[in-house]
A protein has these predicted regions:
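C-terminal motif of bacterial Sec signal peptides marking the signal peptidase cleavage site
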Residues: 12-16
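A gly/proline- and charged-residue-enriched helix-loop-helix capping module
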Residues: 116-132
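Bacterial N-terminal signal peptides that target proteins for export
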Residues: 1-4
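N-terminal secretory/targeting leader peptides
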Residues: 17-118, 135-330
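Alpha-helical assembly-interface signal, strongest on the long, hydrophobic N-terminal helix that forms
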Residues: 7-11
Length: 330
C-alpha cells in the first residue's frame, strides 16, 4: 500500500469511529499535506492550523500533517486535493498557476513597497472574494493565505542601479512571467531545477538566483553569494486550501471551526515569518555576505521596464482580479 493509500484509508476509518451509543461524540481525523521541509513557515502554518482545529473542536476534529513531500510533490498534492483523496494542502501559489490561470496575478512584479501593503491587499474583502472564487472554480476552498515575505535576489555581482542587472545569469523557476520579468530588466534568466542551484552557483554556471530569505538560508545558498539584493519583486504567498466538495459537505459548525482556525493560523504564520526573516538576515550578514537595498529611482526603473510583463498578465487573467489587485497602486 502506498503512503497516500494508507493515509486515505486511515482518514476514512477514523471518520467512522465511535460506539453506537447516543452520548458518543463523533470524532474525525483528516490528512493535510505539504511539500515543504518541517522547519519552514509553510509547515508552521499547517501545524498551527491543525493545533487550532483540535483546540476549537475540543479534540473532536483532528488534522494529521504530512510534511516534506511525504504524500507527493506540489503538483501531486494539488491533483489529489482536487480529487478529494487529501482534503487539505498548504503550499505556495506558484505551482497553482498552471491549474488556475488567474493566480498569475501574483506574478505581477514589484507591485508592493512593503509586506504590510501586500497583506492589506490580500485581506481586502473584495480582492479576497475574487481570488476565493478562482479556487472554488478549480475545486478548492481557500481557507487562508500567509507568506514567507518577499522573494529577493542573491548574486555575486553587486546591484547598485538598474543597469547592474544587465547580463546577470540568474536561475528562475520554469514560469514564463518570471522569465519575461528578468529579461525585461536586462538579466539573462535560466530555468533550472532547484536541486541544481547550489552547484550552479558553486561552479559559476549561474551568477544569481531568487528566493525568499528563508530558502536562501535553509539551503545555504548565501555561502556561494557575495550579495543579497532586496529586489522584493514578488511576494512568496502560501495558501491553505481544502477540497471544496469536502468542505461544503461538513456541518456548518465544523465549517466555522475551520474558518476560525485558518484565520488564527494565518496571522500566526505571518508573525513567525517576520521573525524568521529577521533571523535569516542576521545569519547572512554574520557570514560576510552583504545585503543591498534598492533606491526609489531603481525600483521605478524596474517597474517601467516591466510594462510588457504587466500587459501580458493583464491580457491573460480576469480583468476584475487584475483591477482589484492594482487598485490603489501608483
Amino acid at each position: 500500500m502506498t503512503a497516500l493509500a494508507a493515509v486515505v484509508a486511515l482518514g476514512a476509518s477514523l471518520a467512522g469511529c465511535g460506539s453506537s451509543g447516543e452520548e458518543t461524540t463523533q470524532r474525525y481525523s483528516w490528512p493535510l499535506a505539504t511539500a515543504s521541509p518541517e522547519d519552514t513557515v509553510t509547515q508552521i502554518f499547517a501545524e498551527k492550523f491543525a493545533e487550532e482545529i483540535s483546540e476549537l473542536s475540543d479534540g473532536r476534529m483532528k488534522i494529521q500533517v504530512y510534511a516534506n513531500s511525504t504524500l507527493g510533490g506540489d503538483r501531486d498534492l494539488l491533483e489529489t486535493c482536487a480529487d478529494g483523496d487529501i482534503p487539505f494542502v498548504v503550499q505556495n501559489t506558484a505551482p497553482q498557476v498552471s491549474f488556475m490561470g488567474d493566480l498569475a496575478v501574483f506574478d505581477l512584479p514589484c507591485v508592493f513597497d512593503s509586506l504590510d501593503e501586500c497583506r492589506e491587499k490580500i485581506d481586502n474583502p473584495e480582492f479576497y472574494e475574487l481570488i476565493s472564487n478562482v479556487y472554488t472554480e478549480g475545486g478548492y476552498h481557500l481557507l487562508g493565505m500567509a507568506d514567507q515575505g518577499f522573494r529577493v535576489m542573491s548574486t555575486n555581482k553587486p546591484v547598485y542601479s538598474f543597469s547592474d542587472f544587465k547580463g546577470q545569469k540568474i536561475r528562475t523557476m520554469e514560469n514564463s512571467y518570471h522569465l519575461a520579468f528578468w529579461k525585461a530588466i536586462g538579466a539573462n534568466p535560466t530555468p533550472m531545477s532547484f536541486s541544481e542551484v547550489y552547484i550552479g552557483l558553486q561552479q559559476h554556471t549561474i551568477d544569481a538566483q531568487e528566493n525568499p530569505y528563508e530558502v536562501i538560508v535553509s539551503n545555504n545558498l548565501y555561502e556561494q553569494q557575495d550579495y543579497v539584493v532586496e529586489t522584493n519583486h514578488l511576494p512568496h504567498l502560501i495558501s491553505l486550501i481544502v477540497n471544496d466538495d469536502f468542505f461544503k459537505d461538513l456541518p456548518e459548525d465544523e465549517q466555522e471551526i475551520m474558518t476560525e482556525a485558518a484565520k488564527i493560523a494565518t496571522e500566526y504564520a505571518r508573525e513567525q515569518s517576520d521573525a524568521r526573516i529577521a533571523d535569516k538576515i542576521a545569519t547572512i550578514e554574520e557570514s560576510g555576505t552583504k545585503i543591498l537595498t534598492l533606491d526609489d529611482q531603481t525600483r521605478a526603473e524596474i517597474r517601467k521596464a516591466s510594462k510588457s510583463v504587466y500587459e501580458s498578465i493583464e491580457e491573460n487573467i480576469d480583468p476584475a482580479i487584475y483591477n482589484a489587485y492594482m487598485d490603489g497602486i501608483e
